[in-house]
Amino acid sequence: MPRYKLTIEYDGSPFVGWQAQTNGRSVQQVLEEGIKGFCGQELKIFGAGRTDAGVHALGQVAHVDFETPVAPDTLRDAVNAHMRPHPVAIVEAEEVPDSFEARFSAVKRHYMYRIVNRRAPLTLDRGQAWLVHKTLDADAMHDAAQALVGNHDFTTFRSVQCQAKSPVKTVDEISVSRYADEIEIVCRARSFLHNQVRSFVGTLKMVGDGSWTRRKVEKALAAKDRAACGPVAPPDGLYLLQVDYE
């Protein structure tokens, strides 16, 4: 059975998340319905990251097995047509070896979080970014973020519902950059814990508005206690940016 790698973009606002659930429509469900509309078969799709409700993607990756070969461009265009009007699109499709797995073959995941830092309400970016009125110091946020880079026990920065066997992860990079009224926080690692990036962002926002210092971030990390975390940032501003493979 030929296997295809799909690079997918979506607006997570109307969905309960990536994974198929019984309480609402998911991105996975829309894709599987689109594939069925194209080929008439119920095929299972496997994603690289299980994004939560309201979280977006510019570079989610998934794989799917077809019973017979299909031209990748035909697959992309036909499934996209069947997914309308849902805000989900296959940007690229390519045939890959059977050994490729979207989740387990990934070597790095890149997430971006967008903060719009201004007094005026959001219009075009409503549901696509976190609006923060109080002026944030992006340089202080970037400096504090470096305390979270490396191999650590991230118990403080994971959801109490996180099902990962270990809270230990290696974060390769966190950068905080300001572009006019927008602050972008980019986090890179092989994998992340549930709510880890949003927990980072909520904590770094506290540094940006002067409520926390880098030292307090360091103490929160060392505490290995969820109660020591800052507020969790809303899902609106989070994007699965890219997934890397060898």
Swiss-Prot record:
The keyword tRNA processing applies. Homodimer. It catalyses: uridine(38/39/40) in tRNA = pseudouridine(38/39/40) in tRNA. GO terms for molecular function: RNA binding; tRNA pseudouridine(38-40) synthase activity. This is tRNA pseudouridine synthase A. It comes from Parvibaculum lavamentivorans (strain DS-1 / DSM 13023 / NCIMB 13966). Keywords: Isomerase, tRNA processing. Formation of pseudouridine at positions 38, 39 and 40 in the anticodon stem and loop of transfer RNAs. It is an enzyme of class 5 (isomerase). One of its GO terms (biological process) is tRNA pseudouridine synthesis. Transmembrane segments: none annotated. The active site is at residue 52. Substrate binds at residue 111. Its EC number is 5.4.99.12. The lineage of its organism: Bacteria, Pseudomonadati, Pseudomonadota, Alphaproteobacteria, Hyphomicrobiales. Belongs to the tRNA pseudouridine synthase TruA family. PANTHER family: PSEUDOURIDYLATE SYNTHASE, TRNA PSEUDOURIDINE SYNTHASE-LIKE 1.
